[in-house]
């Protein structure tokens, strides 16, 4: 597959609709990526005079900078993780905050990043921010079998987590797991035949688990949710798009607890999902789930 810096933003109209009854002035996009959602918001809502966009991926951020240049000083872009952003003491600032979690199509299709199991000869990197942190390859070659199993079980919800961890540890005794091809070889005999016959690649959940662990996505998400309540202005809305249960479940739980505590109300009593038409155009969005929360004070 040819490498291409292309990303299709998900649930764009649904994101926009949560602000159609107001004229947002300040907005924060903590996963600005290549700028797809940002472009839609800035075009749809001329009332936005300050759009703060951030991302851990410097490559994506450079694309966003080009794409959003036409909006001039309405846009402010930052290379930052959720934890970096949490250091800012701002309060009651934003009318809206958007987080599009997980990995983007652009990151998947850039095979050298190691996010996709289609990149046979590429290194297993998987870092959102390639300037820091450990790679997926380092994780696979250094962690104990019990630790690997826990990652696959908790972050990937892989039914065969124990067998996968065992196979990896046995394989790396004779050869380091560096590339996607190495990981495929290491786990070649692990999955039952029915998993091999499915359209979804058997390593999908393992790749998901490694990505979440490498990027500390669970920790980052917790920090974001807590910080967002502080950043939002009264009546401000937080929109979060997730792609797997390990992302959606903490969001769902946090919103429920925040509502019980009187911080605001859940606007999505039923989770919002892509339409059939959007899934037809962009099959990768099929697992997307959108939730929205409004702060009261």
From Swiss-Prot:
Reactions performed catalytically: cytidine(1402) in 16S rRNA + S-adenosyl-L-methionine = N(4)-methylcytidine(1402) in 16S rRNA + S-adenosyl-L-homocysteine + H(+)
EC code(s) of this entry: 2.1.1.199
GO cellular component: cytoplasm
Stretches that traverse the bilayer: none
Transferase recorded as keyword: yes
UniProtKB keywords: Cytoplasm, Methyltransferase, rRNA processing, S-adenosyl-L-methionine, Transferase
GO BP, sorted A to Z: rRNA base methylation
Domain of life, per lineage: Bacteria
Entry's Gene Ontology molecular function annotations: rRNA (cytosine-N4-)-methyltransferase activity
Primary localization class, coarse: cytoplasm
Residues annotated for S-adenosyl-L-methionine binding in this entry: 35-37, 55, 82, 100, 107
Keyword field contains Cytoplasm: yes
Cellular localisation: Cytoplasm
Family the UniProt entry places it in: Belongs to the methyltransferase superfamily. RsmH family.
Role noted for this protein: Specifically methylates the N4 position of cytidine in position 1402 (C1402) of 16S rRNA.
HAMAP family xrefs: 16SrRNA_methyltr_H
Protein name: Ribosomal RNA small subunit methyltransferase H
Annotated source species: Chlamydia caviae (strain ATCC VR-813 / DSM 19441 / 03DC25 / GPIC) (Chlamydophila caviae)
Gene: rsmH
